[in-house]
Amino acid sequence: MSTDLCPVYAPFFGVMGCTAAIVFASFGAAYGTAKAGVGISAMGVLRPDLIVKNTIPVVMAGIIAIYGLVVSVLISGNLKQILSLYSGFIQLGAGLSVGLAGLAAGFAIGIVGDAGVRGTAQQPRLFVAMILILIFAEVLGLYGLIVALLLNTRATDNVTC
């Protein structure tokens, strides 16, 4: 039964939030992995002994996709055939917040990781600075995860259809 508060299209927004969370976060993780991986490959030609040590940017980029996966699973757990428009919009906002924050974080991790591993091959003291900058880039994705989790907890508060 469709009402003004619970139209038939309301679950669509929840599904789009679920999709946005995993798709955008995965795009960011893929870009970060690819960009940092190219830097590691180029650096590995001259300094193959540093390859394992410099895989940290690739690992950090992969963590961004996990943020999107967590929110996607949480949103999909709350999806129902009859859903309020409020819940659908909240779920869309949660998915977009973690997805777009993950996209930005993945771009930052990829660019910093690429330049960082290339620089570390020339000057090993740059490694600590690279790690610090990568942590700040990773936190951007974590902010999106926190906002998405807070939004998702509000999606089912006192909502009736």
Curated annotation (Swiss-Prot):
Q: Where in the cell is it found?
A: Vacuole membrane
Gene3D superfamilies, A to Z:
lithium bound rotor ring of v- atpase
Query: One GO CC annotation, please?
Result: membrane
InterPro entries (alphabetical) = ATPase_proteolipid_c-like_dom (IPR002379), ATPase_proteolipid_csu (IPR000245), ATPase_proteolipid_su_C_euk (IPR011555), F/V-ATP_Csub_sf (IPR035921)
The GO biological-process annotations, alphabetized, read as: proton transmembrane transport
What top-level branch of life does the organism fall under?
Answer: Eukaryota
GO molecular function annotation: ATP hydrolysis activity; proton-transporting ATPase activity, rotational mechanism
Quaternary structure? Answer: V-ATPase is a heteromultimeric enzyme composed of a peripheral catalytic V1 complex (components A to H) attached to an integral membrane V0 proton pore complex (components: a, c, c', c'', d, e, f and VOA1). The decameric c-ring forms the proton-conducting pore, and is composed of eight proteolipid subunits c, one subunit c' and one subunit c''.
What PANTHER family does this protein's entry cite?
V-TYPE PROTON ATPASE PROTEOLIPID SUBUNIT
- What is the protein name for this chain? V-type proton ATPase subunit c
